Amino acid sequence: MESVRIEQMLSLPAEVSSDNLESAERGASAAQVDMGPHPKVAAEGPAPLPTREPEQEQSPGTSTPESKVLLTQADALASRGRIREALEVYRQLSERQQLVAEQLEQLVRCLAEKVPQGEALAPAPPDEGSTASGTVAAEETGAAAAAAATEVWDGFKCRKCHGFLSDPVSLSCGHTFCKLCLERGRAADRRCALCGVKLSALMVATGRARGARRAGQQPPPPLRVNVVLSGLLGKLFPGPARASQLRHEGNRLYRERQVEAALLKYNEAVKLAPNDHLLYSNRSQIYFTLESHENALHDAEIACKLRPMGFKAHFRKAQALATLGKVEEALREFLYCVSLDGKNKRARCEAQRDNLELPHCSSQEEAAARGDGSSLMDPAKVKGDGQQHHMKDQEEEEEKWDATSPKAASSKTGKCQEKKRKHCQIESQEETGMPNKASKQDPPTDQGDKPALSLPLASFDASDLECALCMRLFYEPVTTPCGHTFCLKCLERCLDHNAKCPLCKDGLSQCLASRKYSKNVIMEELIAKFLPEELKERRKLYEEEMEELSNLNKNVPIFVCTMAYPTVPCPLHIFEPCYRLMIRRCIETGTRQFGMCLGDPVKGFAEYGCILEIRNVQFFADGRSVVDSIGKRRFRVLHQSQRDGYNTADIEYIEDQKVQGEDCAELMGLHNCVYQQASLWFHSLKLSLKNRILNHFGPMPEKDADPQMNPNGPAWCWWMLAVLPLESRAQLPFLAMRSLKDRLNGIRRVLAFISRNQN
């Protein structure tokens, strides 16, 4: 019996415990009441249907109360794993034309659950009768040798179509895809397939962009090919690169219904890249359109071997098997497709159709003997048009290809055969709706003994991956929207001076405004994989440079601008390119500190200064920034120098000299007296002036219990020096003083002088 063969084919147990036991028993009891004379059968297995009178013949899918009860019983039996008994009930319902394909959803789901994932379920080996024609078989003979010569590193494959990268476009998130794969994305799916970042730049200059212009929106720039990566792929892998171009040309011809011309393109592409699963999968669809079903099956089987977890390859194999009359094998493949993607309505629909047809053993054998697959999909037996079962994700992700070519159409092809061809489009990209468990990692194929990658190292030159700015190996490579790649630090330094690409002069104001530079993932992996020693040396140079920049005693960056004091806030407006670089380096090294000195017409900058610590930076779209910093320590300049356009210095830090005994008591009295005098002066100011001081410098610090506790002295002293109406040259000596007593006396004299002038 066909049901027994199905069970053996899938290695399904006769009975499996299930939570649906009570439902099954209730269905069986109901059937027992309706059927009457079969109480024992109803309790143990499927109940037979009463004899049908000829005059009671019903149209397909007509439901009666007893058929509904038996359908419930069959679904419950299938849920329990009692597939044999469930199939018997389904068969009887089908013979009475009281069963439609849509009612087999529960059976298909249960069968698909029995299909193990991964290596446990390799698709069934092909029949001897499914061998392709001599031409295609000859191609397979030399495929292994050619594949070994053109084996491509997995990193060079597009993560949307899973084929070799063609016209690679690197997005702002750092991931790279084929240009055509990105252009075919609809508005709702315009996101990176890997990280999910929304990509407004995917709207190219088409009708969608014109619609944006009509709506008053600025259309995004067109997608640009990654210049370095495209040239490198063409140099290292001319075969796969050319094959990818031929694939896209064949896709275009197929959409234009030039099926024979598309086949020629794919034949040439397969010779250049015989290990590309996408080529075989797409060519299988072309053969199917041309009604060369044996060749279609042959190519689909190769695609399944190259990518065992690929949904489309198994789906096309199943369609070819069904057309050739091999319903059992087709059902197995359709169930495998359902296990890969349970949400795919097309696979479920076809599996339900094959399940419905399978019990009619004699008709199936006759159809297989005739080689006519059209009877397998008799629309009189199956309710509904399969065209409505297109998966939503596929409709949005793939551009529709009409599989009916005028040249390929034949009067012998049945109506249902045309429907089946319309269901299956050449995949320009894989569906994104694949389940995670199936799409994360593919199990090893027959080519598992081959190395994971094969690169023609003789033609590989490290100079192909050199930055055009520093002339060194890319370190943290970043690709601009115009398609050029630079080291991250090199690009940032260029944007400090001009918001344009250093090579093509395209505007990069958007990059400057967002300041979100994502490293190019594929280029980083490429360098790490094939140039490990060069990368090690490059990283060593970078780390040495960062270590030198993080030294706060030698070559300390100096901002020549104004006076700064310990504990006093110092907001800065940064707009000069050299200081943009300096501030960025201070943040990158983690020190977040730099020196502030007054300018000197003779020496360049003053001998004494103050270290500032960056608390926050607010960037503007044009590259300018406002830095919120605060004074930390005083220093003395030992040696001046320059680095990349800004001043640096070797410095030594200075502190106040502590006193003890009577000198300490005298210092305490002086400290209290000057603090009181300073507080009276501040409170005597006009309210408007006082508010301006408070908004800029904050409130006056409290008096310290021990004025010598801080190596730089009391915080209120520095606050008072910052707000006193003194010229910078008059304030500088206070910064250089190492005696707190001298500093307090100086502040007292200044306050006395100001008070006399006010009076």
Swiss-Prot record:
Skewed-composition ranges (Polar residues): 57-66
Placement of TPR repeats on the sequence: 67-100, 243-276, 278-310, 312-344
Biased composition regions of type Basic and acidic residues, renumbered to the chain: 380-393
Endoplasmic reticulum recorded as keyword: no
Domain Lon N-terminal: 546-755
Pfam families in alphabetical order: LON_substr_bdg, zf-C3HC4, zf-C3HC4_2
Repeat keyword on record: yes
Disulfide cysteine pairs (residue numbers): none
Zinc finger (RING-type): 158-196, 467-505
Mutation effect (A122G): In a breast cancer sample; somatic mutation
Gene Ontology terms: cellular component: cytoplasm
Keyword terms of this UniProt record: Metal-binding, Repeat, TPR repeat, Zinc, Zinc-finger
Record region (Disordered): 1-69, 360-454
Classification via Gene3D superfamilies: LON domain-like, Tetratricopeptide repeat domain, Zinc/RING finger domain, C3HC4 (zinc finger)
Identification of the protein by name: LON peptidase N-terminal domain and RING finger protein 3
Gene: LONRF3
